[in-house]
Amino acid sequence: KREVNNEMAIISAQQFSVEETERYAGSRGDPARMASNFAGVQGADDSRNDIIVRGNSPLGVIYRVEGITIPNPNHFAISGSSGGPLSILNNKFLGNSDFFSGAFPSEYGNSTAGVFDLKIRNGNNEKTEFTGQVGLFGAEFLVEGPLSKHSSASFLAMYRYSTIKAFSLLGVNLGTSAIPKYQDFAVKFNLPFKKGGNLSLWALGGDSQIDILISEQSEEDGVDLYGENTKDQRFGTNMLVSGATYTKPLNETSFIKSTTCVNIENQKSDHDTISRNPNDWGDYTLKPYMAYDFNKVRYSNSSSINKKLNKKNTLKIGWVADYTNFNFIDSVTTNALGQDTADTYRFRFNKIGDSFMFQPYVSWKHKFSDELVLTAGLTSLYLNLGEDSFSPIEPRLGLKWNINDKSSFSFGLGYHSQTQPLYTRYYINDGNTEAHNENLGLTYSKHIILGYSNQIHKNLGLKTEVYYQDLTGIPVERTPSAFSLTNAGSGFARVFPDTLENSGTGYNYGLEVTLQRYFNKNWHALFSGCLYNSKYTPSDGIERNTSFNGMYAANFLAGKEFEVGKNKVLGLGVKVTGAGGKRKGEVDPESSAEQGEVIFKDEGFNEDKFKDYFRFDIKTTFKINQEAVTHEIGIDLVNLTSAKNILNYSYAPNGDGVADQDDIALNYQLGFLPIFYYRIDF
């Protein structure tokens, strides 16, 4: 059984390793797509790696590195979201890391759904090594080794650059005719001190740009999964995290750890509306529609002291502090023609400001005996924005009873809070000159979980969990409607709400089962499944399905490695995924025409579903191990059966001037996608 890194974690915690992200079909070396194999966790759609944890919005998921919550670590990220089409995080520089899906320890605040606690591994401090790889998603290079022959200090550096243009010329369909450009990097210097203590200097970041020019597509090109099919869009993002982590043992029973870093993120875009001649596809005009530029710079510190009081008691005390400068600007046309004059535009966002957030915590672990272990903790969250942005006491509790050497029961309780995406506070509604949501408060979630695990064999484990989550303080519109922020966060669209209040509620409950055969004797297998329900009640008082209530999800993965000659290994892996279809409602054609995007009627919203989701993936690798070098080629065949899984509706007016259902197009997720790579290690 694989234990998580955090000793305070009792329940709803999983460790994932580099080995798993390499072997699992369809994971693409991405921590988020890897986590979607866990019970209770599923991807939002094929074009992005947002994850839905126990029916919650992806907005409730955070990423942490060295105790610091980092910005969205994905290329082409939307402000406030947690996912994107392609991860900046690369499994080659990550060490074994933890993922939490509920009632997480008290050191993890400002999250109501899930937490990635990621570790950047140290470089090899004995010899210099090099890894090079080229494939569909980029050409990448990694080098690591000792900094000096006279110490155990090491370095690790990695860089990746996009190669999609070359593969698009070969006819590979990525869901868009545009060519995304991106690059990312990671670096770490690990510096142990002779008299004890360690300093690590690390950084990671990425830059991305795409121009989706629908106007230049032919009529036969079809829809674009990454853009609106009535607009030309230019979109760019970047993020950078750079920090220093210091650890030092104070004595044999205690140590301190402190991380200080700066986080920088930017998203910018401009859109032009396409007006086509209904009788001639190639006859069109472009009218400026909107442009925005969002910037944030955050300075963070995470510090803690860990003390083993005696054989039975361990105490951890610490805090996370963040100071943020931000600048949000966005203007949009005020008329359908969108003439390029100053008086035809209005600000949707126009705010320069700063904020401070502080999260102190304490965690305690007590061993009543080898059979019974308790963890308990308290945390608090304070944000200096809004009238209800202080959560003074959030208790966390975990209890584990080891029935025998093979089986155990676990129990967890947690009270969690989370701030809203920062930009949502500063939206300026049409007809107003001031933002009207600056006093948004926190969202709260109470978790209760009961689990059972059985180590059937040394390489085979069974785990089941049942859970219930009660959510309050969800932002909903003050005017009665079906809108709730709990349905946001899984796509490329930002939120432009009316006046909001924290009066929405919701709940999630479910049953999860995992049966895992760990890699041994050259093969592994995993089955994970969940049955769940996810509901919310907005300001109109009508209980509805959340947009993420698919009701069920199941995964089966298996893989085996074969020795096919001296120093040669053939690897085969399969993955089968089934899940409930995406929620939908009845489209309002008139409102959609007014807004230029799909608008659903409040009546019957999310009552119906698209057809259920199915995907079959196969991964094949061939590795040649030589004395000083290793070669590996691989191909991941995603959606091998070309299953037509429905993504959503989009607004695509046919030009006849009549607002009706003919203006609404049905979009499908990615079809068959072959992902090839070649890798060399020496």
Place the predicted regions along the sequence by residue.
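Periplasmic N-terminal accessory/gating domains of Gram-negative outer-membrane beta-barrel systems
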Residues: R2-F104, V115, R121
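Surface-exposed extracellular loop regions of Gram-negative outer-membrane beta-barrel proteins
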Residues: N74, S215-E220, K406-I448, Y468-R494, ...
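Transmembrane beta-barrel wall of Gram-negative outer-membrane proteins
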Residues: G135-Y161, L174-L213, R234-S258, V262, ...
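Flexible loop and strand-edge segments within Gram-negative outer membrane beta-barrel domains
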Residues: N198-P249, I264-N295
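Outer-membrane beta-barrel signature, preferentially recognizing the C-terminal barrel domain
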Residues: E228-P249, G353, S417-L471, A488-Y518, ...
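Outer membrane beta-barrel strand-and-loop segments of large Gram-negative receptors
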Residues: Y289-M290, F294, R298-S302, R348-G353, ...
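Gram-negative outer-membrane beta-barrel transporters
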Residues: Y468-D470, F492-K582
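C-terminal beta-signal and adjacent terminal beta-strands/loops
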Residues: T472, A525, T577-G596, Y613-R615, ...
